[in-house]
Amino acid sequence: MMAFKLKIVTPDGLIYDGEAEKLIVRTSGGDVCILARHMDYVAPLGMGMAIVEANGKRRTAACIGGMLSVSGGECTLVPTTFEWSDKIDLSRAEASYDRAHKVLNSGSASDTEIALAQARLHRALVRKSVVSFK
């Protein structure tokens, strides 16, 4: 399979800079698969799993927010948060899920607290699903 240049940059710095055969990410419009020679494309990222296939190996990550750009045969992913599955602390994700669930079930949370808890819950679910993905 042909490769393309992929760069993943977060506010914390450069995560990946190299060749890839395939990138699958969740955009605000749904999942998209980028392969070599993809047409120029820009999309806001949603919250979900990213799959990077490079050198015949597949790596998964939690990819949350940001932008995806494909231009001139090169792909740049600029997520707000990007965590490789082997770097995700499952117990921390489960604790975050439990805290968010508690707020949502309290019956006394404000609209703002509910919105924040829903976002926290979704992020925790993404992290948990990435870790358990086979």
Report the location of each language-model feature:
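Acidic/glycine-rich phosphate/pyrophosphate-binding loops and surrounding catalytic core
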Residues: 84-134
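N-terminal export/targeting signal detector
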Residues: 1-5, 9, 133
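Compact, glycine-rich, soluble single-domain proteins
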Residues: 7-99
